[in-house]
């Protein structure tokens, strides 16, 4: 029997997502070094974050499949897909990893002051709040709404996670050129820059596992992504400690892949595009 072709088109999706995001973020990078107002820069960052979600909506419109659109809306708003047994992992993994990494950093000169919660003015600015709360929502609406499924419909989850992780890391590139942005500060060290890209690839494995173990719930992925962003924002972990966090993330991801190898290495992907 001839295999039914997948309705998902990964290449156009990622091209649109990158084009939208990079246009606004590279414009932001220009204005950040040429006297652009903070309000304008915040708007450009927000518009860039919309890239994945905009790409997903465009692809659903081009596909014109009521089934895919209905499936997307359901996964975007319904809580019934979430497996409650995964909630502790979703909500507490990153606070636990960061605190463990801080403890491990102390013998190597890390500051005990990393064990703190910050809610200072720098955290409460509009650009910061946009990044912390809106970024996970808009990203996951696109990445897990269409992007990851589009790759998974053709390949194993392991290959999907590697390839998507690399694309996701590369997608952030313009942020490194925005003066005053967190990513721009990482350019002072090749290790810290490399750690960001490595952590993003590993993060793809963790979020994708939650995604498919929660019946492709976008809300579950948003909560895990939000937990990571909030934890990294309010716990003042030093850059060396963040490297330790990445190592711990890798160990958790490796344990998940080994323990759930059928999910990661089976070619079939039930429910996608059906």
What label would you give each PLM region?
Residues 10-14, 87, 146, 160-161, ...:
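Alpha-helical transmembrane segments and their helix-entry boundary regions
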Residues 154, 158-188:
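Membrane-helix boundary elements
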Residues 138-165, 212-217:
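Membrane-interface helix/loop boundary segments of multi-pass membrane proteins
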Residues 51, 92, 122-128, 178-188, ...:
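Short juxtamembrane and helix-loop transition motifs at transmembrane-helix boundaries
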Residues 2-136, 164, 195, 233-274:
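Specific transmembrane helices
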């Amino acid at each position: 029997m001839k295999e039914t072709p997948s309705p998902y088109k990964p290449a156009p999706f990622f091209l649109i997502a990158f084009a939208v995001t990079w246009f606004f973020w590279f414009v932001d990078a220009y204005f950040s070094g040429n006297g652009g107002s903070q309000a304008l820069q915040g708007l450009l960052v927000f518009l860039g974050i919309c890239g994945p979600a905009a790409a997903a909506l465009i692809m659903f419109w081009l596909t014109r499949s009521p089934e895919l659109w209905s499936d997307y809306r359901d996964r975007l708003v319904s809580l019934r897909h979430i497996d409650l047994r995964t909630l502790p992992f979703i909500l507490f993994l990153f606070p636990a990893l960061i605190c463990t990494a801080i403890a491990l950093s102390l013998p190597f000169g890390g500051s005990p002051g990393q064990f703190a919660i910050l809610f200072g003015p720098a955290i409460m600015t509009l650009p910061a709040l946009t990044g912390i709360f809106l970024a996970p929502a808009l990203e996951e609406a696109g990445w897990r709404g269409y992007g990851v499924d589009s790759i998974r419909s053709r390949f194993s989850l392991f290959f999907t996670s590697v390839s998507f992780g690399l694309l996701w890391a590369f997608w952030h590139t313009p942020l490194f050129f925005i003066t005053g942005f967190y990513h721009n500060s990482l350019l002072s060290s090749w290790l810290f820059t490399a750690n960001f890209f490595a952590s993003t690839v590993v993060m793809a494995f963790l979020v994708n596992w939650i995604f498919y173990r929660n019946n492709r719930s976008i809300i579950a992925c948003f909560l895990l992504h939000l937990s990571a962003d909030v934890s990294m924002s309010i716990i003042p972990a030093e850059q060396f400690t963040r490297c330790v966090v990445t190592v711990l993330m890798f160990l958790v991801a490796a344990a998940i892949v080994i323990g759930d190898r059928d999910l990661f290495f089976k070619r079939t992907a039930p429910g996608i595009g059906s």
